């Protein structure tokens, strides 16, 4: 969600530009929501597979039973709540963007012809897009961390499943 320069001006074209700007941010946010859901599911499935592999290995090597218990306890304490919280915040941001777009659409074109109205609304839109950009950076980092966790879990699963 990179910032699109604030459009100056007034009238219906200005209003359309603001709506397009918010629509771009909304599309990006929806893509992040899909990625969060995918990674959350992947992490849960991999954690389950790692625990099952560790338990199976514990049957052949009794000392690995303790490792299985440790993994289960660690996973229980470190549930991917960070992804759940990020998803909730992203859903809230999506609602805010959808409301902003709806309000802009309801704004009479006559009101967009006044420079003072455009300046006030434009300033609010710039703040909103700025916060969207900040959230996008945070979501990108979070998704990167989730991807790293997935890679570590995959490697651990392979290690535990080996001979």
Segments from the language model and where they lie:
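Long, low-complexity or tandemly repetitive, helically biased scaffold regions used
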Residues: 3-163
């Amino acid at each position: 969600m990179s910032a699109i320069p604030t459009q100056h001006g007034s009238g219906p074209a200005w209003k359309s530009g603001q709506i397009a700007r918010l629509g771009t941010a909304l599309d990006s946010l929806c893509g992040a929501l899909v990625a969060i859901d995918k990674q959350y599911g992947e992490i849960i499935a991999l954690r389950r597979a790692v625990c099952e592999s560790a338990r199976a290995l514990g049957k052949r090597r009794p000392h690995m039973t303790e490792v299985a218990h440790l993994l289960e306890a660690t996973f229980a304490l470190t549930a991917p709540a960070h992804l759940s919280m990020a998803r909730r915040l992203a859903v809230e941001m999506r609602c805010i963007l959808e409301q902003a777009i709806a309000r802009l659409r309801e704004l009479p074109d006559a009101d967009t012809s006044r420079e003072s109205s455009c300046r006030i609304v434009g300033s609010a839109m710039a703040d909103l897009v700025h916060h969207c950009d900040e959230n996008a950076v945070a979501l990108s980092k979070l998704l990167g961390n989730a991807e790293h966790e997935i890679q570590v879990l995959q490697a651990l699963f392979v290690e535990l499943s080996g001979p």
